Amino acid sequence: MAIFWGINIRKTIKLRDLNHLSEIFHFYDTYIIDLWGVMHNGISLNSKAIEAVENLRANSKKVVFLSNAPRPSFKVVEFLKRLKMSDKFLSQVITSGEAAMHAINENKFGNKFYHLGP
């Protein structure tokens, strides 16, 4: 059982217990799915999660994978390929590292900043 919280244009769905994605898949056009702990455990892919994503795509749902990795998205895609994730899933991978890099390149933090971390 998972706890689900979702947003659509018309309303916010409150936290609730969710037994299966099929209970809510028709509410949304796009699903943003975390990678670590959902799609993989760092060693192997989660076959049930892969099946769920395949079902979403078969029902014309968009899927975006999100990661808090401090690396560019292409590095995470390379890692997912090593885990044997199909290329058909890898066009929409977004990382916090990629978002930060774009923000820095667009000068969204000013001219001076201090980076602390990897």
Question: Which sequence ranges carry the predicted segments?
Answer:
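HAD-like aspartate-dependent phosphatase fold
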Residues: 2-118
